[in-house]
């Protein structure tokens, strides 16, 4: 069942960090942690990665018994993100039986010339997300511990409304914690998908 759909532009700066840096970061911001929760992403594409070739990401995310189908497409700055809220039954059918959810995202994928019957979950990634109040109402800071295909990595993300400004803010935050800032252009999806044999 389709519940609703929304579109927005996602602009974020990200940096992959070591486990020790992750622990240092959480210690530094321990009094500013606002929420911590688990989320699981199920990444969808065709066996021959037709969506990836177009620069498009597609996933189902489960957070606290809430399920969202998301399509991300590149823009000149940031990503166009289309979200479609789905129920658990629809999510399970997509993940377990490759039955793609009805709705605008399905229609968009079909317009790209992709047969939705070829789409299936190829990888999944579980994240322990810690959200931090960084004192800036224009940004959203989080620290993620990600587990996928036997790999664990750690990442800082800062969402904002202008890419260069957001990167500069994240560099400042990293510097404050003694973390070397190295821009991470690889999304969680590309990292998880790169482990597929």
Protein language model features and the residues they cover:
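Phosphate-end processing signature that detects enzymes handling 5′-triphosphorylated RNA
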Residues: 1-197
């Amino acid at each position: 069942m389709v519940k609703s759909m929304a579109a927005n532009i996602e602009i974020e700066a990200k940096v992959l960090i070591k486990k020790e840096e992750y622990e240092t970061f959480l210690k530094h911001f321990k009094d500013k942690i606002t929420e911590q929760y688990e989320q699981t992403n199920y990444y969808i594409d065709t066996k021959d990665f037709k969506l990836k070739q177009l620069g498009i990401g597609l996933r189902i995310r489960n957070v606290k018994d809430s399920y969202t189908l998301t399509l991300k497409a590149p823009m000149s700055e940031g990503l166009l993100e289309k979200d479609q809220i789905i129920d658990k039954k629809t999510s399970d059918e997509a993940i377990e039986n490759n039955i793609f959810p009805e709705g605008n995202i399905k229609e968009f994928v079909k317009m790209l010339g992709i047969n939705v019957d070829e789409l299936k979950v190829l990888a999944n990634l579980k994240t322990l997300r810690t959200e931090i109040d960084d004192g800036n109402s224009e940004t959203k800071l989080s620290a993620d511990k990600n587990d996928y295909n036997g790999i664990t990595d750690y990442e800082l993300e800062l969402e904002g409304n202008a890419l260069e400004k957001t990167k500069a803010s994240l560099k400042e935050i990293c510097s404050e914690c003694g973390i070397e800032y190295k821009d991470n252009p690889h999304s969680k999806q590309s990292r998880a998908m790169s482990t597929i044999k």
